[in-house]
């Protein structure tokens, strides 16, 4: 066939999600550019700060009657209006009036906008609206349920890089940028490490792992009544915490889950599990090729092993050298020798642990005692299989507990070191400013006051010393100190709230974020915060967090913490993360109706 005669290729079809995103973006663009977009304002709460009233006066014009609607272009003049004005009726029928969008603005959303930004919620000032929302979502989105395929732990270095590379307002000084970076780092520590009672934090996950491991050992202790042979009961007893703590400076009855952090406890638990495999396993997979605990246990002859067990020797769980993603600076680690796993189970466990230490998989379960190992081992009788399953889960949980504790300690010390460096950097900046004024001889009273102010800032900053034991108290003192620095104090929260409300309610576009999954997540979280409200994490609320990351706190010994549910946004927010929009061709009531109040520099009414 001649290429000219070939039929044209069929048009490329788009996926439903991509098509929905494009339709949503086109709809938003029409709302921003249509000068006849109307707004209905709903009074559903009090306005104590007068922000809502001033926002309406600045950016919206009320429509009180039909004449004002005609002047605004929302309605055409009717034949009755023409007759009353002395005109003649139109003989031809009037053209069909197009439909225009009506956006619903709730006063509660305007009030809640105070804590829907990093400036209002966390006192991180000076960022542009787009960067502000990105930093705010990184901290506020910690309690969200993780995506098992894409979730990774956020470390302090990556978060500081996000804040450091963000876009700042042009009038922000170098000192204000450094203060914003330090405040963001302190809020990161509180949101990810010191908030024990919120889903998504590492410390909450560590407490739940400790509670789960205690439950596993309690159930393993309960299996002793199922065995009559003294040798079998002794093997199970060696796997229990009371025997593993023998000779150690910590006791399980006194310190409870804090003993799980001890290295010797972990090594003894792994050795006891090997002995349990050697005695209870009947399929041959329990024989380890790296040790000899029971005569011929772990020898090089695999003739007695099943074919599946021989194949599994090439992909043992403990053979792979793993590194925690986004925390590779913690070094390589190996998982314990867990048996009776298929090649798929081994790959799944290794991937889950190296990705996020099993957090995403754990968060998807509804049963607290379930972890990463598959249930239903058929290598022995049900009694022995159940005992091996409980002991294996406990040993795997112990290894992850120690890895998680190490990552928490590393994050905490790294953040304290970074904050101390920020304070020293601020001291050098203010000393430099004071030196410039001093070299200029401070010739007038204004310069002399500035010189005195810089010297006072240096004196106050020298008293800020971040330590592990007094982090929260020192951070509160730092927040109080920066409120006395004009470069940081003068950044307006009202302007940031106005920009946010203008963008959310389709009055003026404040940022042009690409339609990525992360942008959709930020939009949903933002609309949830505007609908339900939030509280600022300021100096009045921070003292409720504890600075002590002791073993008793991390293991939940002093204050037992139940498993918390993640932050659910709700189906309404997920389906429509934005204000309600309706299209109407006929306007019957003018109550609560508004249109844009365009500024003189906005030509043609295109608020872009």
Curated annotation (Swiss-Prot):
Domain of life: Viruses
Purpose of the protein: Promotes a cell cycle arrest in G0/G1 by inducing the proteasomal degradation of host histone acetyltransferase KAT5/Tip60.
InterPro entries: UL27-like_protein_herpesevirus
Subunit structure: Interacts with host KAT5, PSME3 and EP400.
A single cellular component GO annotation: host cell nucleolus
Species: Human cytomegalovirus (strain Merlin)
Biased composition (Basic and acidic residues): 18-33
Keywords from the named record: G0/G1 host cell cycle checkpoint dysregulation by virus, Host nucleus, Host-virus interaction, Modulation of host cell cycle by virus
The protein's name in its UniProt record: Protein UL27
Sequence similarity: Belongs to the herpesviridae U4 family.
Region named Disordered: 1-33
Region forming the signal peptide: none
Gene for this chain: UL27
Chief localization: host cell
């Amino acid at each position: 066939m001649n290429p000219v005669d070939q039929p044209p290729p069929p048009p490329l079809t788009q996926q439903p999600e991509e098509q929905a995103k494009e339709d949503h973006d086109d709809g938003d663009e029409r709302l921003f550019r249509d000068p006849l977009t109307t707004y209905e304002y709903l009074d559903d709460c009090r306005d104590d700060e007068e922000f809502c009233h001033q926002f309406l006066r600045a950016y919206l014009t009320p429509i009180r009657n039909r004449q004002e609607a005609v002047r605004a272009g929302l309605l055409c003049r009717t034949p009755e209006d023409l007759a009353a004005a002395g005109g003649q009726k139109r003989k031809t029928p009037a053209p069909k009036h197009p439909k225009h969008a009506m956006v619903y603005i709730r006063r509660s959303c305007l009030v809640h906008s105070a804590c829907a930004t990093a400036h209002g919620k966390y006192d991180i000032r000076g960022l542009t609206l787009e960067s502000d929302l990105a930093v705010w979502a990184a901290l506020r989105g910690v309690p969200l349920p993780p995506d098992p395929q894409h979730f990774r732990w956020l470390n302090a270095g990556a978060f500081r890089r996000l804040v450091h590379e963000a876009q700042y307002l042009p009038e922000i000084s170098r000192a204000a940028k450094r203060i914003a970076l330090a405040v963001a780092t302190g809020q990161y520590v509180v949101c990810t490490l010191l908030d024990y009672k919120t889903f998504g934090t590492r410390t909450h996950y560590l407490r739940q792992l400790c509670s789960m491991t205690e439950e596993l050992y309690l159930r393993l202790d309960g299996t002793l009544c199922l065995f009559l042979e003294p040798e079998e009961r002794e093997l199970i007893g060696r796997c229990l915490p009371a025997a593993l703590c023998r000779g150690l400076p910590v006791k399980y009855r006194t310190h409870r889950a804090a003993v799980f952090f001890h290295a010797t406890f972990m090594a003894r638990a792994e050795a006891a599990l090997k002995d349990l495999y050697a005695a209870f396993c009947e399929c041959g997979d329990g024989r380890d090729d790296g040790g000899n605990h029971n005569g011929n246990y772990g020898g090089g002859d695999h003739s007695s092993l099943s074919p599946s067990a021989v194949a599994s020797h090439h992909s043992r769980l403990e053979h792979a050298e793993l590194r925690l993603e986004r925390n590779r600076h913690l070094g390589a680690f190996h998982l314990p020798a867990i048996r009776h796993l298929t090649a798929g189970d081994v790959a799944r466990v290794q991937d889950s642990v190296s990705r996020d230490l099993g957090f995403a998989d754990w968060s998807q379960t509804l049963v607290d005692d379930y972890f990463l190992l598959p249930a239903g081992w058929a290598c022995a009788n049900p009694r022995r299989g159940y005992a091996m399953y409980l002991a294996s889960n406990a040993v795997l949980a112990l290894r992850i507990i120690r890895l998680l504790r190490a990552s928490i300690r590393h994050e905490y010390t790294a953040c304290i070191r970074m904050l101390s460096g920020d304070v020293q950097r601020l001291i050098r900046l203010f000393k430099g400013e004071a030196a410039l004024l001093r070299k200029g001889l401070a010739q007038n009273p204004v310069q002399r006051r500035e010189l005195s102010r810089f010297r006072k800032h240096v004196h106050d900053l020298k008293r800020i010393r971040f330590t592990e034991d007094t982090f929260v108290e020192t951070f509160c003192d730092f927040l109080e100190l920066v409120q006395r620095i004009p470069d940081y104090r003068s950044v307006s929260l009202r302007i940031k709230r106005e920009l946010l409300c203008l963008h959310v309610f389709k009055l003026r576009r404040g940022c042009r974020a690409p339609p990525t999954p992360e942008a959709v997540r930020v939009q949903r979280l933002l609309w949830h915060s505007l609908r339900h409200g939030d509280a600022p994490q300021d100096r009045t609320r921070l003292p409720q967090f504890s600075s002590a990351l002791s073993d008793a706190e991390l293991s939940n010994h002093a204050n037992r913490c139940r498993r918390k549910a993640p932050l659910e946004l709700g189906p309404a927010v997920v389906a429509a993360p934005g204000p309600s929009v309706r299209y109407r061709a006929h306007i019957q009531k003018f109550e609560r109706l508004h249109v844009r109040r365009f500024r003189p520099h906005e030509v043609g009414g295109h608020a872009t």
